[in-house]
């Protein structure tokens, strides 16, 4: 699973996931399912915010390419992926500036158009069950919840899906692709079932060629959202090095 994750996701997402796990004393090499889940969640958060801006009139627009000098503001503030201290600093700043209620738990995003925090969920189970778990934990009507599944289902607070259908379809397609790639390599069952995960871990430890059969191509396109995060946690030289550090399987 670890090798699959390192080839399936952008290196910067992988590093953010590793930092998040280490912050809680977790090892990506041991808790590989959690590693995969965190990388997936990070990517969904970044895809959620990609290309969405607010123009000078305060209208929400989608811009995939255009005039870099245009007066545009990112519609979403990304909170997920930052260390806890920085994340709470961002949340406090937003609350002080906008007057919105401070959440009890760190949310994933802030929507400047709707003036609300957003909690993003990615589940391997039924969306409505995971939605209720999130809602019971957060216990706040102020934080908007949006849940995606690997089967293309989604659920959001008051059926308000925030994004346009095409943007959500990109997220769903990516999740479905991840599921199919895992399934084709016999990793999906262990990703869903903790018992199967333990069995798979023992099998992986005995394997002499953990890379065999894994994809060697990864998208080199850096998410616009990731670009906005880069200055806060790495310099340009380190970023360039990470982009070039895609894991390659050893040749026989």
From Swiss-Prot:
It holds the Pfam family Flu_PA. It comes from Influenza A virus (strain A/Duck/Czechoslovakia/1956 H4N6). InterPro entries: PA/PA-X, PA/PA-X_sf. Its main location: host cell. Plays a major role in the shutoff of the host protein expression by cleaving mRNAs probably via an endonuclease activity. This host shutoff allows the virus to escape from the host antiviral response. Hijacks host RNA splicing machinery to selectively target host RNAs containing introns for destruction. This may explain the preferential degradation of RNAs that have undergone co- or post-transcriptional processing. The record marks 202-203, 206 as: Important for efficient shutoff activity. GO terms for biological process: viral RNA genome replication; viral translational frameshifting. This is Protein PA-X. The probable endonuclease active site in the N-terminus and the basic amino acid cluster in the C-terminus are important for the shutoff activity. The C-terminus acts as a nuclear localization signal. The C-terminus is recruited to host protein complexes involved in nuclear Pol II RNA processing. The active site is at residues 80, 108. The keyword Transmembrane does not apply. Belongs to the influenza viruses PA-X family. The record marks 195, 198-199 as: Important for efficient shutoff activity and nuclear localization. One of its GO terms (molecular function) is RNA binding.
């Amino acid at each position: 699973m670890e090798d699959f994750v390192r080839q399936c996701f952008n290196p910067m997402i992988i590093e953010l996931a590793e930092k998040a796990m280490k912050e809680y004393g977790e090892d990506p090499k041991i808790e590989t399912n959690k590693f995969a889940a965190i990388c997936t969640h990070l990517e969904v958060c970044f895809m959620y915010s990609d290309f969405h801006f607010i123009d000078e009139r305060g209208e929400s627009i989608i811009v995939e390419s255009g005039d870099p000098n245009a007066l545009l503001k990112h519609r979403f503030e990304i909170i997920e992926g930052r260390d806890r201290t920085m994340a709470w600093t961002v949340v406090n700043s937003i609350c002080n500036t906008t007057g919105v209620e401070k959440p009890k738990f760190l949310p994933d995003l802030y929507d400047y158009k709707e003036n609300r925090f957003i909690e993003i969920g990615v589940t391997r189970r039924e969306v409505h069950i995971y939605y209720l778990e999130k809602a019971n934990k957060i216990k706040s009507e102020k934080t908007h919840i949006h849940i995606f599944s690997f089967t293309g289902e989604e659920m959001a607070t008051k059926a308000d899906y925030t994004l346009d259908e095409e943007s959500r379809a990109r997220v769903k397609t990516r999740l479905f692709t991840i599921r199919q790639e895992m399934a084709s390599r016999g990793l999906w069952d262990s990703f869903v079932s903790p018992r199967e995960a333990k069995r798979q871990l023992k099998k992986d430890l005995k394997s002499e060629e953990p890379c065999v059969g894994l994809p060697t191509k990864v998208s080199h396109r850096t998410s616009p959202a990731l670009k906005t995060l880069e200055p806060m946690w790495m310099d340009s030289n380190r970023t360039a090095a990470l982009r070039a550090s895609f894991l390659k399987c050893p040749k026989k």
